Amino acid sequence: MTKQTKLITLIGICLCFCMAQFAFAQSDELYTRDSTYTFSETSGNVSLLRLKKGYLLGDGITFISGKGNFNLSPSLQTLYLVNSTNKNLSSPSSTFVINRARLNVFSNLFDNKVSLSARLNFAANYASATTGNRSFNTVLQEANIEYRPNRTHVFNFGLRADYIDGRETRIEGESIGFIDRSLLSDAFDAIFDFGIRYKGNYRLGGKHLLKPYLSFTTGDGRSALQKNYGGFKYGVRLDYLPFDKFSRGGEFYMDDLYREEKPKLVVGVVYSYNDGATSAKGTNGGRWLYGDANQNILLPSYSKFGADYLFKYNGWYSMGGFVLTKAKVPSNIAGEFRLDGSFSAYTASQTAQQIKDRVLSRLNLGKGFNVQAGYLFPVDWAVGARYSTLNENNVTASFSDYDKSYTFVTTKYLSGHALKIQFELGYSQLKEALKTSTQNGNYYSQLQFTIQL
């Protein structure tokens, strides 16, 4: 092991063992915190707020009026990575980056019936799965309005992380139990999209809960803020909770911070259909546009099926998911549009099968599986392990150099997800076709600090 690798490994282990402890977790469910606010009257009108009593990291700064509130919450994640692609760990490389630098804006109005949410990421490091880009917004991640007529029904309008990706994407980047999302999520989850959504919360009797989610979006991701190039994406998710809801939003973060006294489980299935896919997985909309002989736009359809679960009990948690994607190509595609908008017709020598394979090769097609588990010790120190595998369709171009990934993480929670240190060791295995006598994968260690104000 090299000096660089030894150093970052030693730093990570020391920090995780030596820090003191303190707790708050994120949730996409709206709830009222039981803290007290201090007001100052102004002309008999509105009250202004300062930091509330009992303030915890992650609460943000909130301004209160008689009809609602307005919250600002910045967050920062710094990442230090050392990795090597050689079997003997020689010639390592190091990367120090700002992983996330976000500003969250949230407002509640009219007794929590209406909420507004926006999020900016000033450290966006998005890289398209395929080269080229027509339009892409790297800073604005969320901007939406939510209407809650009652506790059962919620309607959402705008840009946000979608309900119809894997369960990992329901968890904020600051609240996942690992430093990075899994190989499965990277391959198949578009995450952000612009559209109209519905979510429900139905009690079936006793402790049984059913949560349906419906989604109607552009299918172009954040590119849709400039133009919707393709058709639309339709999706549905159905979650079942047999043992009632999780404590304090525990459905929307990984480690069992509040040590569930009784077993909690959510099992879900999800399906989405994009009737006009223009990018590899719905992230970089408008990347690939095809047309018929008259230059009318023709696009492939892209469908995705998934199943997942999350279980928690007494400090333990386990989460897993499976994804399968397929596509269908129109038979009369005659060419494609270049990034400058001009049309490039395919040659007469290209067969229908070759054209079909060309279109399919630009989509993330295949299947994958991810499973992970972890335990939180009473001293707010957690350990976890994860295994992910991908099986690409034979026709699709390689959207990942790796087909298996093994990850081990330890996390020291100083104030819940609002202040924590994570250290991770991992190995991603190269696909057989890419292995050499000296390289069979990527070995890495990384250290990340997270703070949310």
Question: Where is each model-derived feature located?
Answer:
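Bacterial Sec-dependent N-terminal signal peptides
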Residues: 1-29
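Outer membrane beta-barrel
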Residues: 59-84, 90-222, 226-244, 364, ...
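Detector for outer-membrane/organellar transmembrane beta-barrel domains
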Residues: 229, 239-243, 247-393
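Outer-membrane beta-barrel "beta-signal"
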Residues: 235-245, 412, 419, 440-453
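Conserved C-terminal beta-signal and adjacent last beta-strands/turns
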Residues: 367-383, 404-414, 419-423
